[in-house]
Amino acid sequence: MPINSSSDTLNDLQARVAAFRDERNWERFHDPKSLAAALGAEVGELLEQVMWLSTEDARSLTPEQAAAIRDEVADISIFALHLANSVGFDLGEAIDDKLKVVAERIPPSQDAPARKADA
């Protein structure tokens, strides 16, 4: 499977990470608990990239900072796809379903509440 296609759908990516896993015989390590733990660790690595930045600095990242964040978000996304495969659901469908729930709760006409950092 090609590894560099920006036109892949989320379903394509979900299939590609499954194939990547299978090619390495990693399925035995990919239970929901282990994948959730790995996902949490990757989120922690993302947080390390921005934890000590001011809100202003976080909005104007250096190219190096942006690249590090990009790598961590990719890791998070890969583990989320692996977790979806392990549990047995279509992540794209789950995202669509969640957006519908949030849209019902928060109509587009509502302004976002101000945050302390923005006030």
Feature roles, as predicted:
Residues 1-119:
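Flexible "arm" and connector segments at domain edges
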